[in-house]
């Protein structure tokens, strides 16, 4: 039976904490002026069982363009990464402070919104994938560069490298579950590739799948002669489904739910009313 948590003014982040019955969330203060809020850049924990609410991070300015806010991502084991307009890092949940990993040149949108680097953990929790703001191709300001890459930080080798170039600002990398049939702990990464990388703020995207190291990159949906996807995070099926050559990836395309086989690129339209806006696997 649904019940109210009493939590309000959440814009960028709320998610289950892995292995617990608690939710982590960040809040904003409503404002009459655009974009409609002032981010607190805080983090709280709420227990579904007891209703207890605990603070993890105090409110802060949030760095460059901190008024927009920040977002977070849990690894399968419960490590927490953060992203804000000027960088990414980890959250020390015991010490309750931020541990910066990498500075990112913030994007000057010349508007009342800010770009947040999207990020996701690899299925083994050893790699953090994120979208980074690439240097400009000419003499324009670094903050005005129209190019974005997908990079990865390995916590085993303590190294960061680019694995996909000029993807677009809304690439939204997403890692599959571990492939149990393999001797190695392998997984794939899906992301959105801008059709026109230098205009990725307003143009559409195609779904791409690659191995965890960026190799074997394949564009699988939609067809080259079809309109592209609106920005979204590709949603991997949590487990393999019999009869498919790869794992299913769910996307919203032209208002409908589609399932795309990551192995052969076969796509299946599930709904037809054009009313789907958000999706998730259960």
Locations of regions flagged by a protein language model:
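Sequence signature of WD/YWTD-type beta-propeller architectures
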Residues: 1-282
């Amino acid at each position: 039976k649904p019940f109210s948590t009493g939590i309000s003014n959440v814009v960028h982040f709320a998610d289950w904490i892995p292995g617990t019955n608690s939710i982590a969330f960040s809040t904003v203060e409503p404002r009459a002026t655009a974009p409609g809020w002032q981010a607190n850049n805080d983090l709280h924990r709420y227990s579904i069982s007891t209703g207890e609410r605990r603070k993890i991070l105090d409110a802060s300015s949030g760095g460059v363009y901190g008024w927009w806010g920040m977002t977070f991502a849990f690894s399968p084991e419960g490590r927490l990464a953060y992203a804000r307009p000027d960088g990414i890092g980890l959250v020390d949940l015991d010490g309750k402070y931020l541990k910066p990993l990498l500075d990112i040149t913030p994007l000057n949108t010349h508007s009342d919104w800010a770009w947040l680097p999207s990020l996701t953990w690899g299925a083994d929790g050893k790699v953090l994938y994120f979208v980074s703001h690439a240097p400009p191709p000419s003499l324009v300001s670094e903050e005005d560069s129209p190019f974005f890459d997908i990079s990865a930080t390995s916590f085993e080798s303590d190294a960061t490298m680019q694995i996909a170039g000029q993807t677009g600002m809304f690439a939204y990398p997403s890692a599959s579950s571990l492939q149990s049939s393999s001797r190695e702990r392998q997984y794939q990464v899906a992301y959105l590739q801008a059709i026109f990388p230098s205009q990725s703020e307003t143009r559409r995207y195609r779904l791409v799948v690659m191995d965890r190291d960026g190799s074997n990159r394949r564009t699988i949906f939609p067809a080259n002669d079809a309109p592209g996807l609106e920005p979204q995070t590709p949603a991997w099926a949590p487990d393999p489904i019999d009869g498919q050559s790869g794992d299913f990836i769910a996307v919203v395309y032209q208002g409908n739910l589609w399932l795309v086989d990551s192995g052969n690129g076969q796509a299946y339209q599930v709904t037809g009313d054009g009313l789907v806006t958000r999706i998730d696997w259960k």
